[in-house]
UniProtKB/Swiss-Prot annotation:
Belongs to the CLU family. This is Clustered mitochondria protein homolog. mRNA-binding protein involved in proper cytoplasmic distribution of mitochondria. GO terms for biological process: intracellular distribution of mitochondria; mitochondrion organization. It comes from Candida albicans (strain SC5314 / ATCC MYA-2876) (Yeast). One of its GO terms (cellular component) is cytoplasm. The lineage of its organism: Eukaryota, Fungi, Dikarya, Ascomycota, Saccharomycotina. Its main location: cytoplasm.
Amino acid sequence: MSSEEKIEETQQQQQESVPVKELLLKVQLPSFFNVGDDYLTIPSSYEENIADLKQALNIIVLCRNLTNYSILIKGIDIIENFGELITFEQIISHFELDKQEEQEEQGQEREISELKIVIKEKSYNLASIYEQISRFREVIGLHYIDRLSNDIGSCGGVSKFNGIQLDDIKPKEAKKEESTEKEQQEKEELSISKEEVSKISDFAKQFISDSFDGNDFTKLTKFDDINGKVKIPIKSLTISQWSPVPPFQQAKGDLLYLSLQTLEHETFNITCHFSGFFVNKSSTINFNPTIKINEKGKFNKSYLLYDLVCQLSPLFSKTIAENEINLSDSTKYPETYLLPGNSFPAYPWLVNEKDLQNVPDLSRSQLSSLINGVDGADYIKDWNNDIQSIKELPTTTVQERIIREKLIQKSLFEFNKTATETAINIIKGNIPPLNPDESSDKFIYLRNGIFYSSGTSTVNGFENTGGEEASRYVASKDLTGIKLINRHDIRGISSLVTCIVDYMGKRVVCQAPVPGILDTPVITSPTTDAEGKNEAEEPESEPVEKVVYGLSSDGSRILEDKSFEEPLKQIGDFFHLKPHKVQLSSSSSGDDVKTESNLVVSKDTKGLKGTDGRKYVIDLYRTTPRDIEFIEQHFKLDDDHQETSYPHGEALIRHEAVNEWWRRKVAVLFKKETEQLEKEGKLLDKNQDQDQENKPQIAIPTDQVVFNPDAFSSDNENEIEQDREEVREISKFIKEKLIEEFLDEIKDQVIPFDGQQLTDVLHRSGINMRYLGYVAERLVVKKEKHLVDLEELIKENEAKAEKKREEEKEKEEKEATESEDKKEKKEDKEDAEKEEAEAEEEVPTKATYQLTLANYSTLHRIIIQEMISRSVKHILRNLTKSLPSYLISTAIAHFHNCLFGGAINPTPKVDFIDEIYKNFCSKSDLESFIKLTHDDVIKLVSKEVFSRFRYKLSSNWINTIQLPQLFREIAFKYGIQWKSQNYPFTKEEFELQNNQNKETPTQIQIIETKSSKKSKKKTQTQVITEKSIQRSSIFIADDIIGFIPIIKDSSYKSTIVEEIYSNARSHLVQGNKEMGMALFNELLAINESIYGKVNPETAKFYNLVAQVYQELGYDIEAALIGRKAVILCERSCGFDSYDTITAYMNSAYYESSNEQYLNSLKLYKEAMNTWSLVYGKDHPTLINTLTNLSESLLKIKAYDSALELLQEALEITKKLNGEISEITGFIYYRIANIVVTLNKFKESKELFDKAYDIFMKLLGPDDSMTKQVAKYVSSVGLYVEYLKRQQQQQQQETQKKSKTKTKAAPVNNIATTSTSTTKNGKKSKKNNTPPQSNPEIANQSIDEILRFIEGKPSGSKKSNKKK
C-alpha cells in the first residue's frame, strides 16, 4: 500500500470513527488513604482501557505509590477476568450499565457519563514486594541516579536552554482593526520603551564574529544542572543481610528483609510482609523479624513502604517537598529533567568534569535482583516472539494502530538497550563466547534471548569482494532493508529484530534469532534400508538445512519453497525487484544448478521457517542493485591496484536512488500512455461529462520498471544482458542525474552545518557517501565555471553600460543645440511618458541574491572535512581493534597528537604507560601506535581518503582544514567523549597555555617497578608515584572521559503520526481551521504516547507543530512549543546537532513574531555560538541571519545596532561571495538606506555608488534594481551638492554680515529640508533646487524594498499618480 493510500485510509478511519465519548471515572481508594467517602475523579473516555487507568493512577500524587491492587467494577476483578486492554466501552456493554432498569425489556440504551470503580489492595507476594520497592525508588528520585550510574555514556541528555534566561512569553498588544493612513504607514514601528530598546541594542553588539564562542569549549559546555539540585531523601535502602527469608519465617508471611538508613542517621530493619511493611527487632548481629513495639505500645507498620518511611523520618517528607520546590524554581520546563522514554539520550562529545558525579547507593548493586524477577528469569526474554506478536495486532481503527505503534516502539527500544549493554560487555571481554576455539572475529554469543556476532562473522561469503570490509558493509545494508520492511508493514513475512553496535573500534551485530534456528536437530529412531544397513549409523550425515527459500547455507543449492513466494513477492514489489531465474556453477560436480521457477527476491535473501510457525526473511542487503559502474572503475583485485583499490566490491545503490529512478521511469510510461489515449481520442476535455464506469483507465505497466538484484552478483555469463543493462542504467543514474541535480539545487539551499547533516542531505538525495570525492571534484569545476561566467557577464554588462552612456551623451549634445523652452517641454513630455510606462509595467529584477560562490566553497570545505573524519574513523578502528580496552585511550590520544599537533611536536612520544600494563599486551600491539609520527598519520589519512572516496588531498591539507571542527567530527564518528577544556591547535596557543599552566601542572599517577637496594637479593617492587607533567603535545590519555557506542537499530518512524499530520494539514489548506487544529493538538498527545516525551521524533514533531501554529497566527503557542522543541532537540539530538541549531533559529523567529525581540536575539546568539563550534564563524547562513536581525532592529528604530549587524554581514559576504555579488550589492544598498536615516549623506552616497556599480555589472544597466539604485545615487548625490552649496552660501553670508546671525535651514531629515519649486505646475530643472528623494527609504523592510523594486504595490504607500 502506497503512502497516499495509507493517508486516505487513515482519513477514512478518522471520519468513520465515532466522536469521543467522555467518561468520568469515580475511583474509590483503599481505606488506608484516609480519604473517607470521597471519590477520586479521573476524566477519561469510552475508548480508553484499564491500562490507561493504571497509568493515570501512577501519575496522581495521592496514589502513585500504590502498586499491588485489584480494580473492581460491580464487585468483579476486571484485570483478573478481562485483562488490562479491555476498554471502558466494552466494560459498560458487558455489565449492561448503559441500559435503564425500567427499559431493559425494550433494550433501549443510554449513554452514561460516570463509572464507579473500586480499588482494593491485594496481599503482597515477593514479586509485588520487588515492584513496590522499585516504585519507591522511582518516587524518591533514585531512578535518576540509577540511570546516571548504569548509562552507556556520561552526561546524557544535557541542555543549555535554562542558562539563556529568556523573559516570560507575553501576549502581543491587541491591535485595532481599523487604522488610519498614518497608522498603516507606521505599522512596522512598535511601541517599545526606550529602556528595552537600549537593552536590545546593547545585546545586539554581541553579534560580531569575534564575540562568538565557537572555539571556547568551556563556555559552550556550561550545561544546566537541574538534577544536581535534587537531594536523595534517605541515606540508603538495601536488601538486608538477613535476606532471603528462612523457611521457618516464610510460613509466617515474611517475604523479604530491608535495611533503611535515614537522613537522621538512624538505621531501621524492615520486614516485608504479605500484609505490608513494618519495623522489626533485628539488628546487625541479632535476627528477630517480629514487629518492634516500644514501651508505650507504639509500632510502625504501613501497607505502603513510602508511608512507613514517612513515619520513621521527618526529614524524608521535608526533603521530597523541597525537591519539588527546587525543580519548579530551577526551570519552567519539565522537559529539561524528564528521563528519556523510548530512546537513548544524546551524549555530548565534550563533557564538563564538574558534571561528572557518582552518588553512593548501596542498593544500586542489588537492582538486578529487583527488576529481573524473583529468580532472575525476567532478564531472559523471547524478544522475537514478543515483537512479532505485537506486529500481528489488529490495525482496523486508528486507536488500534496507535496502541500497536506504541508497543512496537517500546519493545524495540528495550531490545536495543539490552543488546547494547550486552554488546559493550562482550567487547570488554566480560562474557565468554559459545565457540572459544574459533578466532576472535568468529566468536558468537547467545545472551538474554539475543544472538551476538561480530560484524565480520560472515566474511567467508565475501572472499572475492573485500572480505571483512564487505562483511561490515552488508551488515549495515541488511539493517536498512529490515528498517524499510518494518516501516512499510509487510504482513505474512517476519524480519529479524536487529541492531548494530560499534564500540571502541569493534562491531557487534545483535539479532533476536529465528525460533529453532539454533536448535540441534533431534535424530529420530534409526531406519533400516533394503540392504539391512542402519541409516542413522552413517558416520557422515549431512547437516539439516534451515533455509527453505534462496541460496542454501553452504551456497551449493537454491531452494524454492512455494509457500514463501507470495509473502516474499510483497518485498519484491516494494523494492521493485524483477522475478528472475538464477544459475549457479557447482564447485563439486561441475554441474550447473538452476532454479526451476523465477525467484521473486535475490538469491542471497533467504527464507526460513521458524518453529513458531512464522515465515522469516534474512539477509536483506541485496534489495538494491550493485553500483556496477563504481565497482568496475574502482574495485581492483590485482596486486598492482591493491593499495589504491576501493576496500570492497559490495557497493550497493541506496533505496532513495532506486525509488527516484523508478518514479521517473513510471512518469515516462504514464506520459506515453496519456499521449496514446489522447491520440486515440479516448481522453475527453475536462468540461465534457463522462460516466465513471466508461472513463478510460490509464494502466501503467509498472512491472516493466524493475531490476534484477542478482545482476553482476556473480561471474555467470548466462545472465540476461537486459538485466545487466537495467542495473547499469541505475548505476549511471547517480552520477549523471542525482549528483548533477543536487549541485544545481545547492545554490538555493541552506548548506549543511556539519558532517551528519551533510550525510542526511546526500542520503535523502540518493547519493552514497563514497561519491564525496566525485562531488568535491564537481564542485571545483562548477565554481570555476561560475567565476568564468561571472567575468563574462560583467564584461557584457559593462559594454552595455558604456553603450548606454554614449547614447545619452549624444542625446545631451543634440539637446544642447535646442532652445531652452523646447528642451523643457520635451523633458516634461519624456518624464510623463516615462512615468506612464513605469506605472503600466515594471519588469521585475533579475537579481536572485543566491549565495552561489559561498555555497560552493562551504559545501566543498564540509565534504573535505567529512572525507577526512570518516577516513580517520576507519584508521582508528584498525589501529585499536586488537588493543585491550585499557590502552585505547592512550592510543587515541597519541593519534590525535600526531594528527593535530604537527606544528607543535611532529614526533610526539607516548609517555606514562604503566609498566604493568605493558605486560598485558603484545609488543606488536603497542608498537602499532607508539611509533606513529605526524608525517605517518598524514600519509595514512591521505591514502585512506583516496581509497574510500577516490579523492587526492593536497599535500598541505592539514593546514587548510578547520582543526576544532575536524576534532569534533572524529569524536562523533568513533564515539569519544573528551574533557571539556580549550585545546591549543596552534603552536602559539600551545606555548601560551603551557606558560599559564606552569604553576598548576597536570598530576598523574604512575605505577613504577623499583629494585630494592637494602636486600642482598635483588627484588623488584611496584610503587605508585604521582608525577607532575608538562604537556609535550595537545592531548593526554586522561583527557578522554570515555567512549560511547554508535548504535544503528531497526526502529522506524511511525506512519500513523505522518498520516494524521497530512490529514490535519489538508484540513487547514481547505480552510477547516478548527478541525485541523484539533487534530494537531491530538497529534501532540499521540506522538508523545508512541515515542515518549524526550525523543528525537518528538522533538522534530514539536518543531513542525510550532511552525504550523506560527503560520496560523498563534504566536504565543508557537513560541511556547518552539522553546520546548529546543530543549527536546538538545537532550535527544545533541546540544550541537543541526536539529538543535535549526530549533534555536526557529524559536528565535517565533519570539520575534511575538514581538519579544530581546528573547529572539538571545536565541539567535545561542544558535550562532553553536554553529561557530560546529562549522566556524563564516557559514553562509550567517549572512541571512544577520540581515534578518537588522530588520527586527529597524522595526524598533535601533538604527545603530542594525547598521552594525549589516556591516558584519557585509564583511562575511565579501569574504565568501566576493566584492562583486548580488547579495553584497544588496547589503551595501541596505546599509546606505540606514546611513541616510542617520543623516550621513556623504557616506550613503559612497555606499549607493558601490551598490550601483555591483548591480550594473551583474544585472545590467536596464535592470529595475540597477535603475532603482541609480535613482538613489542621483537623489542623494544632488542633495549632498545642495548641502555643500548651502554651507558655502552660509559661510559667505556670515563673512558679509559678521554681526548678524542668519538662520540656516535644518538638515535633520531629507523630508524636512527638501523643497521644490514648480513652474506652471511642472517640476523646475534648476540646479539650485534639491532633488525630491524618498524620505521613507530607510524605514522600509527588505521585503518592502523588494516588492517595490519588483513592481508590487506596498501597503504603506500610495500609488504614484501621473501629474
